[in-house]
């Protein structure tokens, strides 16, 4: 039992005409767990074109998950607010583009998902490391970051606008840069 006839990985073979023991996958086979039932969810594309929108409802939980995953995978290069001023570029590596440029603010969500999946320019692909559900969560958080850095007073709900001009509550912590 201990000495069964077998091939070691990538060992040569006299049995097959190509001389390889490792066999290519049969066309049309799908690995267990890899069956795609929603192409938009898996690729960010509809009918082969980068699409906009999300394949699921955007919720607070989704954005919070995206924030967590963004901090793990993205902030080192893209910075905490998506401005491209992360720790890696500060050490001399190429700076990624800011998410707050007009080009990326108007890019489709499918484009953002596709770049995260397949890489672009100096950015490596993360498709094998981040599952599609987390990539969509990161895209939702990226959209929230974009809104946070480009919002106007008109974007604030009327019920919350009064809070913008209200003086801080007694005993509240001072704003950044304020005195104690």
Where are the model-predicted features located?
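Short, flexible turn/loop "capping" segments at secondary-structure junctions
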Residues: 91, 116-117
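Flexible coil segments in periplasmic/lumen-exposed cytochrome c-class electron-transfer proteins
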Residues: 71, 103-109, 124-180
């Amino acid at each position: 039992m201990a000495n069964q006839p077998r091939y070691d990985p990538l060992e040569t073979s006299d049995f097959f005409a190509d001389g390889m023991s490792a066999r290519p996958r049969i066309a049309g086979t799908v690995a267990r767990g890899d069956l795609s039932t929603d192409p938009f969810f898996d690729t960010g594309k509809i009918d082969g074109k980068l699409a906009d929108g999300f394949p699921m409802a955007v919720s607070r939980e989704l954005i919070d998950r995206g924030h967590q995953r963004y901090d793990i995978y993205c902030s080192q290069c893209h910075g905490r607010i998506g401005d491209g001023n992360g720790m890696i570029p500060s050490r001399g590596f190429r700076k990624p583009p800011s998410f707050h440029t007009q080009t990326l603010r108007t890019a489709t969500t499918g484009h953002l998902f596709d770049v995260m999946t397949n890489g672009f320019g100096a950015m490596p692909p993360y498709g094998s490391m981040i599952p599609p559900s987390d990539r969509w969560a990161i895209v939702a958080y990226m959209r929230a970051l974009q809104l946070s850095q480009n919002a106007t007073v008109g974007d604030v709900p009327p019920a919350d606008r009064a809070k913008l001009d209200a003086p801080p509550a007694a005993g509240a912590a001072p704003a950044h840069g304020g005195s104690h």
